[in-house]
UniProtKB/Swiss-Prot annotation:
<dbReference type="InterPro" id="IPR011199">
    <property type="entry name" value="Bacillithiol_biosynth_BshC"/>
</dbReference>
<protein>
    <recommendedName>
        <fullName>Putative cysteine ligase BshC</fullName>
        <ecNumber>6.-.-.-</ecNumber>
    </recommendedName>
</protein>
<keyword id="KW-0175">Coiled coil</keyword>
<feature type="coiled-coil region">
    <location>
        <begin position="372"/>
        <end position="435"/>
    </location>
</feature>
<keyword id="KW-0436">Ligase</keyword>
<dbReference type="Pfam" id="PF24850">
    <property type="entry name" value="CC_BshC"/>
</dbReference>
<dbReference type="InterPro" id="IPR055398">
    <property type="entry name" value="Rossmann-like_BshC"/>
</dbReference>
<comment type="similarity">
    <text>Belongs to the BshC family.</text>
</comment>
<dbReference type="InterPro" id="IPR055399">
    <property type="entry name" value="CC_BshC"/>
</dbReference>
<dbReference type="GO" id="GO:0016874">
    <property type="term" value="F:ligase activity"/>
</dbReference>
<dbReference type="Pfam" id="PF10079">
    <property type="entry name" value="Rossmann-like_BshC"/>
</dbReference>
């Protein structure tokens, strides 16, 4: 079942009216103070500090793993949707930096397209949350890979970060700070203490949220959906970080991470000493987010929408109204060489993203049709010359020899013409192949949609108007951004 359809069938809040109904909800009483301290340390632009004032109205929140150079372009599309909705409601646009995520495979690669060749930097990262991974050991490799772009003042600022998640937050500030985007890193020393009350409550009933998820999963399954978050017996929604981040299980009045056992008191003492060591799993993270932030709207991708749909019971358990849910905008950047190819074949960029080579060949068929029709007419002339010889044999034998000479001349000329046609076809086929390769490299790199591979910061570094075009784009649906 499509995620958006599932959300409608579950009756979950969607749309701007639902967002407006959730404004003026209070966040954590120390939120603005903590965020101001965090942003001051990151030397955020003035527009971001002004956006903090709009937290009194509410927040439209989105988030993503802390990928290199801001991660794939979908990060900026999420931020764009959140900022547009926030502006329309008079609220603040907040970006949750998923610094607690320890799936480093999601964040260790950086793909750039330069001189029509995709280039990849892959960092060897430890299996730790990105908020724990220092940037210093990787800074020079990043600079070398970025080349002349590393001298751009925005990247110079971002590369001063101490951790991978801070690098990500600084990229957001460098490129989207002027629009007032507020990054929020839950592992930042200024912000992690805001979650202590939520952690204490979860430790007091460690299986309650997991049971709520499983009940909702059964409801979704009854509707024909496939819930992604079903919890195993004894699994909590909390991770403990020791030498690595491990899921906690609860049984017989005690917790275990598979290495040792803990009492609730011991875990609480760990959290009080360093609240960033005890972090929520996916089934609890949005709720923890909304216990601290005055979230009125939540911008997600299609896969996120599926798991958020399972969380209504967890929200109810914490006495929270679920925020209004919005799908992010989907984007594809079209640079001048690609635009010329698309226009030549009258091909929509989204058709190529959806269908790839099949869409291109279908569009190219019309371009090849006149060429093929001409070749067929030449073949028809040869066949007509042969038929004339056959008719002459029956009609007048004296016509046979001259018609055979005529046929031979036609055949010779046709053969020469055929060779020229084949050469022209080969050249045209090479043009087609070259155009197809270029479209794939730009729009479907590695067989994936462009927005899931190349960072939008790459386009902003290459085209001065890229950020303006994004700011002017629709906040929802499919958007083609023509640059250059």
């Amino acid at each position: 079942m499509e995620a958006a359809c599932l959300v409608r069938r579950l009756g979950l809040p969607q749309g701007e009216e639902a967002l407006k109904a959730r404004l003026r909800r209070p966040g954590h009483p120390r939120l603005r103070e903590a965020l101001a301290a965090y942003l001051k340390r990151l030397q955020a632009p003035e527009e971001v500090f002004r956006a903090l004032e709009r937290l009194e109205v509410g927040a439209v929140v989105t988030g993503q793993q802390a990928g290199l150079l801001g991660g794939p372009a979908l990060t900026f599309y999420k931020a764009h949707t959140a900022l547009c909705l926030a502006d329309r409601a008079g609220a603040a646009g907040v970006f949750w930096v998923a610094s607690q995520d320890h799936d480093v495979e999601e964040v260790r690669h950086l793909h750039l397209l330069r001189d029509e060749v995709p280039e990849t930097l892959s960092l060897d990262l430890p299996p730790l949350p990105s908020g724990r991974i220092p940037l210093a050991p990787h800074r020079e490799r990043l600079r070398a890979f970025l080349g002349p772009w590393a001298k751009d003042y925005r990247l110079g600022y971002a590369l001063e970060a101490e951790t991978l998640s801070e690098f990500f937050a600084r990229v957001l500030l460098a490129f989207l700070g002027e629009r007032g985007l507020v990054p929020f890193d839950p592992m930042a020393e200024e912000l992690a203490p805001l979650f202590l009350e939520a952690l204490e409550r979860e430790l007091s009933d460690p299986l309650g949220s997991a049971e709520a998820i499983n009940r909702e999963a059964e409801r979704i399954r009854a509707l024909g959906g496939k819930p992604p978050l079903r919890r195993k017996p004894g699994a909590t929604n909390l991770f403990l970080e020791t030498d690595q981040r491990r899921l906690l299980f609860y049984e017989g009045g005690a917790f275990t991470d598979g290495v040792r056992r803990y009492t609730a008191k011991e875990l609480w003492e760990i959290a009080r000493a360093d609240p960033s060591r005890l972090t929520p799993a996916a089934g609890l993270r949005p709720v923890f987010q909304d216990l601290v932030l005055p979230t009125a709207g939540f911008v997600v991708g299609p896969n996120e929408l599926r798991y958020v749909a399972e969380l209504s019971g967890v929200y109810a358990r914490y006495g929270l109204a679920m925020p209004a849910l919005f799908l992010r905008a989907f984007g594809v950047v079209v640079e001048p060489p690609v635009r010329r190819i698309l226009e030549k074949y009258r091909l929509d960029p989204w058709a190529f993203v959806d269908e790839g080579e099949a869409a291109f060949l279908r569009a190219a068929e019309a371009w090849l049709a006149p060429f093929r029709a001409f070749r067929d007419r030449v073949e028809g002339l040869l066949q007509e010359a042969s038929r004339l010889v056959e008719e002459a044999e029956a009609l007048e034998p004296n016509l046979v020899r001259p018609l055979r000479r005529f046929r031979a001349r036609v055949r010779g000329e046709a053969e020469r013409l055929r060779r020229k046609l084949l050469a022209a076809q080969a050249a045209r086929d090479e043009v087609l192949a070259r155009h197809l390769r270029r479209l794939k490299v730009h729009l479907l790199p590695f067989g994936l949609p462009q927005e899931r591979v190349y960072p939008y910061a790459m386009y902003a570094l290459r085209h001065g108007e890229a950020l303006r075009r994004l700011a002017e784009a629709p906040w929802e649906g499919r958007v083609a951004l023509y640059l250059g």
